[in-house]
Amino acid sequence: MLNRNFNLLWLSQIVSSIGNKLTIFGFPLVGIFIYDTTVLETSMITVMSFLPSLLFGTIIGVVVDRGDKRKIGIFTNIICFVISIILFVFSIFKILPLWGFYILIFLLNTFLLFGSISFYSQIPMVVEKENLKKANYKMELSNSVIDTAAPSVGGIIFGLFSAPFIFIIDGITFILASFCQILLPCDIEKYKVKTKKKSIVHIREAYNYVFNNQILFKLAMSYFVLVFGIGIFQSIQFYYLSKVLNVAPYTIGLIISVGNIGLVVASISSLKISDTIGMERTIILSFILYAVGFTLYYLSSEESTLSLFVATMCIGAAMPLYNVNATTIRQSNVDLSMLGSVSAIWRIFGRGLIPLGATIGGGISTYFSVEIAILISVIIVLLGLCIVLFSDELKKYT
C-alpha cells in the first residue's frame, strides 16, 4: 500500500506542478507579447529553461545523494518562490531587459532541478519496489489533469490580466509545496550516502553504473534521442502556432487543453495498457504517438484547428505512457545509494539535450523554416524508436 509519506510527497508535487505548468505556458507568451521576441529569441527561453540540467545536473545529483533530500526540497521551494515574485514585479512593470528575463528563467530552473532530483530520489525510499509502477501511475495521472487544465487557465489569465500574473500563482504553489514537505518526518531518509570519496569519483561511478548496465544504457540512449527531438519541437511550438498559423493566445490555450484529453485518457489507462501489452511495447507506442503528433503539426495550416487538437492529443497521450513505464524500469534497476546521481544523468543527457534541440530548432526555423524544424523533430523521434525496437535487454519487460 502507498503510505502517508508518499501521499505528502505526491501532494507537494501536485501543488508545485500547477504553478510550474502555468509558468511553462507563460514564459514564451511573456517573451512574445511583452518583449516581442523573434523565433530565435523565443527558442532561447527553452534553452534557458533546460540549460541548468546540462551544466549542473551531475553535481546536483551528488549533492542530493549526500545531503538531506527533505531539507533540499523545502529550501529550494522557498528560493523559487522569491524568484517567481521577482519575475512578476520586473515583468509587469517592464523594467527587466530581455537578457535579465533569461537570467531569471535560468536561475529558477536551476533551483527547480535541486527540488526535482531530491523529490524523485525520495520516491523509492518511501514506496516498496513492487508498488513503484502504481506510484508512478498516480503521479502521472495527477500531472495529466494539471497539464490539461493549466494552458486554459494560463490563457484566461493572459486574456484577463497579462502573462506575468502567472508568476504570482507559481510563487504561491512553491510555498504550499514547502509546507507539505515540512510535514514529512525528519527521518524519512534511511539511505543517506556516507562516504569520503571525492565528488568526481562519485560522479564517475554513477556514469559507469549507467553505461555498464545494459538495461539502463539502452533506456537512456532512447530517452536522450527522444528529448532531443522534443526540444526542437517545443522551442518552436508556440511561435509556430502564434506567428505562422496566426492562432490567438486564448485559442492556443484551448488547443493545448482540449488536445490534452489524450494526456488524461492515457494517464488513466496507462497502468492497464502496461499490464496488458508490457512495459517495453507501451514505450514503443509512446514513441509512435510522439511521431504522429509532430507530423500532424507539420501538416497543419491556419484552417486545420482540428488536426492541431488531434496532434496535441497524440503528444499528450505519449507522455504518461512513456513516463510511467520508463521511470519504473529505471527505478527498479538503480541502487538506492545512486538514486540522485542516476536521476541527474537522466537530466543531463535528457532534459539537458533540450537546450541543444531548442537552439538547433531556432536556427533551422530562422535560416530555413519552422516547418522544416518540425519535420526534423519527427525524424529524430523515429531514430529513438529504433533503439527501443532493437534492444534485446528491454524485451524482458514485454
Residue ranges of model-derived segments:
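Helix-loop junctions on the cytosolic side of multi-pass membrane transporters
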Residues: 121, 125, 167-197, 389-398
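Transmembrane alpha-helix termini and helix-breaking/packing motifs in multi-pass membrane transporters
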Residues: 28-34, 88-93, 149-169, 243-244, ...
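Hydrophobic core of transmembrane alpha-helices in multi-pass small-molecule transporters
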Residues: 14, 97-114, 225, 305-321
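Hydrophobic alpha-helix/TM-entry signal in multi-pass membrane transporters
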Residues: 5-13, 73, 101, 144, ...
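Cytoplasmic helix-loop-helix junction between adjacent transmembrane helices
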Residues: 105-147, 151
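C-terminal transmembrane bundle of multi-pass solute transporters/carriers
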Residues: 55-58, 66, 70-72, 76, ...
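Loop-to-transmembrane helix entry/capping segments in MFS-fold secondary transporters
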Residues: 39-40, 129-139, 249-250, 336-345
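Helix-loop boundary and gating motifs at the non-cytosolic
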Residues: 1-52, 208, 212-259
